[in-house]
Amino acid sequence: MARKTAAEAKETRQRIIDAALEVFVAQGVPDATLDQIARKAGVTRGAVYWHFNGKLEVLQAVLASRQHPLELDFTPDLGIERSWEAVVVAMLDAVHSPQSKQFSEILIYQGLDESGLIHNRMVQASDRFLQYIR
C-alpha cells in the first residue's frame, strides 16, 4: 500500500477529530471508544493510533480544534462593550453552528470527564473572563 501524502494524513487526522466530536456527543466522553471513532471517520483503528496515542489524546485534539465563546482573547484595549459584543456574537454562532453546538455539549454535559481536561479548560476560561470584566 502506498504511503499517504502529508496532505492526506492531515485530512485523515481532521476526519478523526470531527468524528470524535460526534461520538463524544452521542456516547459521552467516558463511554466513547476508539473503535466507534474509527468507524465514524471511515478509517481503521490503526489509523487512529497512528495519529493519536489514545482516547485522551483524541479528546485533547478535539478541544484544541475548537474555541468556546468564553475562551476568546480579551484585551483591555478592546473595551468592555466590544468584549461583551464578541461574546454575544460567539454565543450566537455556537447556537447556530452544528459543530459549535456539539462542542458546547461536550464542554457543558461532559465537563466531568475522568481526565479533568474539560473541567479545567472551562474553569480557566471562566477565570480569565471574570478577571477581565472586574
Curated annotation (Swiss-Prot):
The keyword NAD does not apply. Residues 33-52 bind DNA. GO terms for molecular function: DNA-binding transcription factor activity; transcription cis-regulatory region binding. Induction: The ttgVW operon is induced by toluene and styrene, but not by the antibiotics carbenicillin, chloramphenicol, nalidixic acid, tetracycline or gentamicin. Residues 10-70 form the HTH tetR-type domain. PROSITE patterns: HTH_TETR_1, HTH_TETR_2. It holds the Pfam family TetR_N. It comes from the Bacteria. Keywords: DNA-binding, Plasmid, Transcription, Transcription regulation. SUPFAM superfamilies: Homeodomain-like. Coiled coil: none annotated. The keyword Metal-binding does not apply. Unknown, does not seem to be involved in regulation of the ttgGHI or ttgVW operons. PANTHER family: HTH-TYPE TRANSCRIPTIONAL REGULATOR ACRR, HTH-TYPE TRANSCRIPTIONAL REGULATOR RUTR. This is Uncharacterized HTH-type transcriptional regulator TtgW. It comes from Pseudomonas putida (strain DOT-T1E). The gene is ttgW.
